[in-house]
């Protein structure tokens, strides 16, 4: 469980030394300077167009991806009462043609051809459109993007199609617990509030009616709400801010001036006099939760004082004496988070969300009593300046060493944030902590009382008496019982609860290490027989952070479902054992992960390097002697079984992909086998298994970042001395990939409890050779956009439609997937095959220039800049796992792609894609779609394990 992190900010008097103001444009419409981190070398220009559109321009001469986002201050909360989902449908329609670019899909094809991505989302109070693209094509993308907001066509033919896609999205997510929870929760809200409506829409709410065509409603909504003064635009590119400004003025000043009618955010979220409320919700998956949601005034204007962040840090604490630690000791909770929930201009919520065990749900009243006892304790003795000062120091460090984010992520976040914060604080707002304000914090704490509570209980065993209209959620809603209200409003205390102490992991030494290096890539250091360290001193990101990985590979990790389950439980027990100790480290920017994998388990420590050795030593001690108590084991065992059962309730396309990988890899086990093994596991079996797992191992480590060679060796020595000891060295090879037979497709039919059908078609590659991988990647690149355009936009087969290259242990392949509410698997497969044959003509007619563009775009993706140290570390770690010790896998793959000629690619497409006598697999499910009885007889895989065992293998990459 991870607390919702709320970073503090710097003191105003530190701005001169800790932040750098960016230049701004002044033309009678000036804005203040933008506060940026010292590590940020971009240029910024904030500007307002003549039509009122607010713009932020960002110049980054080094970026390989340009990006833009436009946010409109209108969303589903402004849907007409009789047209739920209208704003969402409008969002879809803007992608389907404008006066200047009338062809549906032309914008997306242009973006994808030039190595980009595009998307949009609709929220109750705003709608966000965004894209990224290879830097040199920004101008062309903006020309197309701007027309969304100037001259959208709303072609009647595409309205009918896209209404079907919106309905497919609705259908696909009918069993999504996230959407179902929100749908039920909204039954308690004031129907006038933007958050209360049915946001997605479906074929009924968006249907044409006599005298009321949905196209007319779309145009009316667009003309009323898509106004420049209600929009914010962020553009990031290599060009100067002045040139970017000139482009934006030229392209976006055609957006109609004026301001839209704002959503009714002045309406309280809950009708007056209805709180406190108790709501019970039955989920699809086996999930148990208690959400204590408190109605509060909006905290947006108090962002510089961070009252909610302060409160969240104490209520969400996971250290000794915390509410979470106490609940976990009782066996009642698996996780806890605290922080702001809904946030609007006038009203919001503060929420404490607790993931419960079965017994925890039964004892929700005692849990509530302890929560309110803690709130009283904080009010009486916990509002102190030292906590505030510590949070400010943490924020000062994080802001000083703020890492870059992808352009795609940055622009969409800033465009949305511009509605709520002064432009000068777009970066700084999450970090800003101006002054400790005890009275303000206490005023918000006073709102966290039972009288302001909407308690939501989620669990499969709850009793309910109502059914929500759109998603069919079973729920109940009533006034919080008077005895519960009286109990929680009393003055009870809990002596086992106490407030956190000062954080011992706060980084002190933040100096960048100096090291003489002959090469700028990891170098090998043999620590002992069977244990290798790879070391790379890297301060090129200007950050005192580092990533230390160690993988323990064992021949006993996953050869059976039992071993796989026990390895998983071992990692879970140790992580749980260390949670209270490591939580302060996490807050201080020093985290760890412990996870099992196909050959054993990996420990990763990441963050500021100053106190990593302290954390590592404690983790190693726990790995050596895990505390397998009955309470801990039972709780984690139940949690694992619950997770495995819930896999059968994932989206059909997710289940199809997961089953495909199980059919192809001999170290991945089916959930039913793992459930059986997990239910049979005992604490005694786990205790006996750990020495067996560790007795003979192969170990490899990576220290990458702000380390000297001596510091890296010291960390490795801790691993050798504290964990490995005199354990025997072993060689643990990779798992192997099943070699499919060249024949008619083998078909695996799943029984998935979901109304949608799904079909995944997988074409297996011939070898691990780079030349083969390059061709499969090119095929995925070339077909991605047209496959989507054909099967989703034109044929309306479903909401989840995608295709692309799919590696399995570096063996290339292609996968095509459609999840459909109205098409049976046979029809989906036929459409896929027809697409491939039709697209062969496009490849035959493809020009050298077009092919070169696809090839260049793919190379750009392969060679994309690694914006963060962690991205480079992840690549190094993957290359180490693959025994790719040149650390130049990207360069070699890019070279192989560049060597593929158009003639080579045409031959490959004919022999490896169109020839379905080649090895391929089909995974499907019929759902509630008709056609299962009429399906053509196929070469069915009845016993998947026997199928996998009967086939040959590709040699793994390390053999």
Model-flagged regions — what are they?
Residues 67-132, 197-202, 212, 317-335, ...:
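M16/MPP (pitrilysin/insulinase) zinc-metallopeptidase core fold and M16-derived inactive scaffolds
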Residues 52, 70, 88, 129, ...:
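Buried hydrophobic packing residues in well-ordered domains
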Residues 96-100, 132-165, 346-403, 555, ...:
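M16/insulysin-pitrilysin zinc metalloprotease superfamily fold
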Residues 1-8:
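Bacterial N-terminal signal peptides that target proteins for export
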Residues 23-30, 234, 389-539, 656-727, ...:
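C-terminal regions of mature proteins
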């Amino acid at each position: 469980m991870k607390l919702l992190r709320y970073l503090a900010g710097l003191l105003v008097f530190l701005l001169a030394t800790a932040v750098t103001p960016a230049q701004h444009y002044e033309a009678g419409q000036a804005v203040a300077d933008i506060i940026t981190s010292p590590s940020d070398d971009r240029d910024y220009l904030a500007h307002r167009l003549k039509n009122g559109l607010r713009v932020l321009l960002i110049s980054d001469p080094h970026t390989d991806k340009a990006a833009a986002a436009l946010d409109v201050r209108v969303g589903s909360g402004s849907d007409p009462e009789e047209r739920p989902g209208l704003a969402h449908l409008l969002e879809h329609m803007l992608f389907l043609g404008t006066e200047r670019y009338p062809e549906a899909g032309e914008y997306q094809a242009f973006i994808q051809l030039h190595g980009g991505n595009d998307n949009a989302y609709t929220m109750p109070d705003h709608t966000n459109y965004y894209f990224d693209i290879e830097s040199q094509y920004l101008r062309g993308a903006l020309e197309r993007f701007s027309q969304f907001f100037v001259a959208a066509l709303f072609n009647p033919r595409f309205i009918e199609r896209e209404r079907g896609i919106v309905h497919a999205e609705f259908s696909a997510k009918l069993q999504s617990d996230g959407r179902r929870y929100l749908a039920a929760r909204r039954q308690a809200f004031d129907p006038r509030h933007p958050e209360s409506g049915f946001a997605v829409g479906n074929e009924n709410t968006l249907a044409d009616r006599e005298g009321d065509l949905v196209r007319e409603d779309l145009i009316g909504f667009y003309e009323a709400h898509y106004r420049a003064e209600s929009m914010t635009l962020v553009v990031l590119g290599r060009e100067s801010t002045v040139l970017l400004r000139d482009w934006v003025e030229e392209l976006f000043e055609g957006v109609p001036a004026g301001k839209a009618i704002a959503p009714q955010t002045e309406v309280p979220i809950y009708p007056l006099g209805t709180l406190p409320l108790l709501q019970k919700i039955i989920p699809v998956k086996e999930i148990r939760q208690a959400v204590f949601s408190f109605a509060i005034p909006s905290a947006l204007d108090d962002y510089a004082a961070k009252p909610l962040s302060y409160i969240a840090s104490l209520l969400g604490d996971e250290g000794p004496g915390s509410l979470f630690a106490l609940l976990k000791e009782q066996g009642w909770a698996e996780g806890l988070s605290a922080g702001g929930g809904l946030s609007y201009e006038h009203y919001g919520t503060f929420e404490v969300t607790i993931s419960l065990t079965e017994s925890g749900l039964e004892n929700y009243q005692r849990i509530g009593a302890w929560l309110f006892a803690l709130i009283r304790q904080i009010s009486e003795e916990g509002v102190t300046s030292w906590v505030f000062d510590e949070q400010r120091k943490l924020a000062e460090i994080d802001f000083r060493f703020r890492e870059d984010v992808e352009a795609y992520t940055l622009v969409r976040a800033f465009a949305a944030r511009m509605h709520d914060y002064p432009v000068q604080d777009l970066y700084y707002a999450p970090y800003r902590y101006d002054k400790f304000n005890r009275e303000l914090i206490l005023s918000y704490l006073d709102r966290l009382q039972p009288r302001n509570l909407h308690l939501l209980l989620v669990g499969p065993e709850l009793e309910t008496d109502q059914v929500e209209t759109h998603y069919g959620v079973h729920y109940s809603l009533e006034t919080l019982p008077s005895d519960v209200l009286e109990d929680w409003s009393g003055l009870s205390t809990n002596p086992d609860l106490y407030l956190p102490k000062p954080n011992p992991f706060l980084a002190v030494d933040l100096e960048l290490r100096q090291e003489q290096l002959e090469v700028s890539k990891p170098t090998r250091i043999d620590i002992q027989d069977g244990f290798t360290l790879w070391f790379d001193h890297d301060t090129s990101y200007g950050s005192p952070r580092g990533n230390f990985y160690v993988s323990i590979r064992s021949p006993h990790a996953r050869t059976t479902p039992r071993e796989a389950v026990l390895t998983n439980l071992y990692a879970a027990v140790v992580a749980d054992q260390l949670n209270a100790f490591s939580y302060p480290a996490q807050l201080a920017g020093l985290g760890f992960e412990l996870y099992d994998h196909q050959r054993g388990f990996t420990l990763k420590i990441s963050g500021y390097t100053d106190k990593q050795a302290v954390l590592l030593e404690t983790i190693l001690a726990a790995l050596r002697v895990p505390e397998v108590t009955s309470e801990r084991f039972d709780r984690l065992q139940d949690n694992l079984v619950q997770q495995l059962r819930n896999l059968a309730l994932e989206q059909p396309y997710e289940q199809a992909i997961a089953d495909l990988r199980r059919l192809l890899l001999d170290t991945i086990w089916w959930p039913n086998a793992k459930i059986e093994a997990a239910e049979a596991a005992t604490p005694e079996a786990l205790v006996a298994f750990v020495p067996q797992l560790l007795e003979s191992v192969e170990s490899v480590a990576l220290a990458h970042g702000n380390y000297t060679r001596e510091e890296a060796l010291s960390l490795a020595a801790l691993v050798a001395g504290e964990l490995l000891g005199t354990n025997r060295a072993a060689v643990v090879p990779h798992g192997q990939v099943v070699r499919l037979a060249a024949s008619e497709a083998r078909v695996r039919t799943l029984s998935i409890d979901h109304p949608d059908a799904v079909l995944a078609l997988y074409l297996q590659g011939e070898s691990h050779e780079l030349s083969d991988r390059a061709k499969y990647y090119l095929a995925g690149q070339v077909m991605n956009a047209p496959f989507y355009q054909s099967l989703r936009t034109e044929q309306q087969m479903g909401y989840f439609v995608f295709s692309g290259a799919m590696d399995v242990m570096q063996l290339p392949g292609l996968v095509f997937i459609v999840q459909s509410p109205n098409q049976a698997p046979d029809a989906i497969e036929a459409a896929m095959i027809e697409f491939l044959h039709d697209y062969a003509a496009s490849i035959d007619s493809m020009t050298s220039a077009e092919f070169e563009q696809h090839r260049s775009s793919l190379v750009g993706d392969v060679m994309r800049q690694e914006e963060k140290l962690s991205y480079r570390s992840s690549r190094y770690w993957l290359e180490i796992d693959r025994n790719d010790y040149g650390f130049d896998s990207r360069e070699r793959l890019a070279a192989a792609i560049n060597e593929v000629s158009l003639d080579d690619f045409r031959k490959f497409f004919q022999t490896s894609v169109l020839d379905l006598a080649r090895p391929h697999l089909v995974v499907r499910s019929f759902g509630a779609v008709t056609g299962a009885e009429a399906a053509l007889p196929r070469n069915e895989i009845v016993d998947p394990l026997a199928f996998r065992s009967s086939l040959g293998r590709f040699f793994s990459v390390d053999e």
